[in-house]
Regions:
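Conserved Lys-Pro-Asp/Glu-containing loop-to-beta segment of HAD-superfamily phosphomonoesterases
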Residues: 7, 97-109
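A general structural motif
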Residues: 3-5, 64, 97
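Flexible, glycine-rich phosphate/dinucleotide-binding loops
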Residues: 23-25, 76, 109
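Substrate-recognition element of Asp-dependent hydrolases with the DxDx(T/V) motif
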Residues: 49, 54-88
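Short His-Asn-centered micro-motif
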Residues: 10, 48, 70-72, 103-104
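Structural recognition of alpha->loop->beta junctions
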Residues: 86-101
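Active-site neighborhood of HAD-like aspartate-dependent phosphohydrolases
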Residues: 1-48
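Short, flexible active-site-adjacent loop segments at beta-strand->alpha-helix junctions, enriched
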Residues: 20-21, 73, 106
Length: 109
């Protein structure tokens, strides 16, 4: 019988996704308007790029572990949830998309 792989949870923000790249892509007006809550800028998550080396590191982890992506999204940004889902599809593909968990509880065991 094959040994079951251990489960690993990986965060998105500043682990897989370079949050700063999204901030760098918004206008000055948006920065000022959302200065206290930049993650509430509409479609900001769709503008983010991967952290350098993160895609390769994720792929390496999938060779040794059952990898799930565990992230949260702000309640006040209705585009954040679908944008995170589309980001995973775009950069990590089908299996990762099926292993994405969006929750406000990031302390899952």
């Amino acid at each position: 019988m094959a040994q079951k792989m251990k489960i690993v949870y990986v965060d998105m923000d500043n682990v897989l996704v370079n949050f700063q790249s999204g901030i760098d892509s918004i206008t000055e007006e948006e920065r000022e308007s959302f200065k206290d809550d930049l993650d509430d800028v509409p479609v900001i998550f769709s503008k983010m790029k991967p952290v350098e080396g993160a895609i390769e590191a994720y792929q390496e982890l999938t060779r040794h572990f059952e990898v799930y992506i565990l992230s949260t999204a702000p309640w006040n940004n209705p585009s954040a949830w679908p944008d995170k889902l589309l980001w995973v599809k775009k950069y990590l593909g089908g299996l990762a998309y099926k292993r994405l968990i969006l929750s406000h509880n990031k302390h899952l065991d």
